[in-house]
Amino acid sequence: MTKLFIADLHLSESRPDLIQAFIHFLETEARTADELYILGDLFEFWIGDDEQSPLQQQITHALRTLANHGCQLFYSHGNRDFMIGKRFAQECGMTLLPPVYPCELAGEKALLLHGDQLCTDDEAYQRFRRITSWPWLQWIFLHLPLSRRVKIAQQIRQGSHKGKQQKSRSIMDVTPQSVITCFEQHKATLMIHGHTHRPQIHDVTLSSNQPARRIVLGDWDTDLWYLKIDDRDINLISQPINTAKN
């Protein structure tokens, strides 16, 4: 069985090259997989399942086509598209996952997550994350006119960009102790996440001296990144965007 994992594509109308590369990926590499896991931030922002923008419709069709081909699709919310709802998931043929999803991978107890919850040193972001997860606040936002939601999303993006420029790189990475705590709470030895845009396979030593691995998926920008797990290997793969879309 072949399983693929991607995250942090940040699709938007301003990057047609990424849209084309993603659709090509779904029509080629993903067609050979049994399962595809999207671990958050597929879109640059998400203002509601009811938007029905050309981009949303295009991606819905591409994902539904893959699902109809027999590939099971799973989605973990990111910090940019945390309001993706059941309607969009059903239209795509995707299953929505909880914030931390325990499963069995390559004979190991594994955890799948977006990864932003591990960046606990960034207290300002964690405060923002808690506030935006309030159900009543999401309900109010989703009942605003679409034009107003777009403006709010743009303001949040601009604020996020300015905030990142003022933060050190270390504070925006995962906190090592939070990683260990997450591993040990779930009794896992393998973790797969995105968010930090720092693709790497890390060896981790837990408190009991038990070895574990943390695999960080890369973001799609000049290169696309995906993790491939089959019965034999675990491979973190990258490919230039300009060749992936041809």
Swiss-Prot record:
Keyword tags: Cell inner membrane, Cell membrane, Hydrolase, Lipid A biosynthesis, Lipid biosynthesis, Lipid metabolism, Manganese, Membrane, Metal-binding
Entry's Gene Ontology cellular component terms: cytoplasm; extrinsic component of plasma membrane
CDD domains xref list: MPP_YbbF-LpxH
Co-factor: note: Binds 2 Mn(2+) ions per subunit in a binuclear metal center.
InterPro entries: Calcineurin-like_PHP_ApaH, LpxH-like, Metallo-depent_PP-like, UDP-diacylglucosamine_Hdrlase
Superkingdom of the organism of origin: Bacteria
Catalytic activity: UDP-2-N,3-O-bis[(3R)-3-hydroxytetradecanoyl]-alpha-D-glucosamine + H2O = 2-N,3-O-bis[(3R)-3-hydroxytetradecanoyl]-alpha-D-glucosaminyl 1-phosphate + UMP + 2 H(+)
Residue numbers binding Mn(2+) 1: D8, H10, D41, H197
GO biological process: lipid A biosynthetic process
Keyword Metal-binding: yes
Similarity section: Belongs to the LpxH family.
Protein name: UDP-2,3-diacylglucosamine hydrolase
Gene that specifies this protein: lpxH
